[in-house]
UniProtKB/Swiss-Prot annotation:
Cofactor binding remark: Binds 1 zinc ion per subunit.
Role description: Binds the 23S rRNA.
Protein name from the UniProt record: Large ribosomal subunit protein bL31
Cofactors (names): Zn(2+)
GO terms for biological process, alphabetical: translation
Length: 73
């Protein structure tokens, strides 16, 4: 590498929203804020969140189900 053309590669602390602090190195040279990390991400923790899709589908059908129906003769 050429001398004096590369940014300084410093040690920084990356802090997650859950409070986990990860020590890493970066050219950013400022503390980093993370949204998720391996301590709180559902993929790594095994805690999956399920959405209440059934209630939404029923609500949609009750509101708009009659628009697509054909009239019986």
């Amino acid at each position: 590498m050429k001398a004096d053309i590369h940014p300084v590669y410093e040690a920084i602390d990356a802090t997650c929203s859950c409070g986990n602090v990860i020590k890493t190195r970066s050219t950013l040279a400022a503390p980093l804020s993370l949204d998720v990390c391996n301590e709180c991400h559902p993929f790594y923790t095994g805690k999956q969140k399920t959405l209440d899709v059934g209630g939404r589908v029923d609500k949609f059908k009750s509101r708009f189900g009659a628009f697509g129906a054909t009239k019986a003769k």
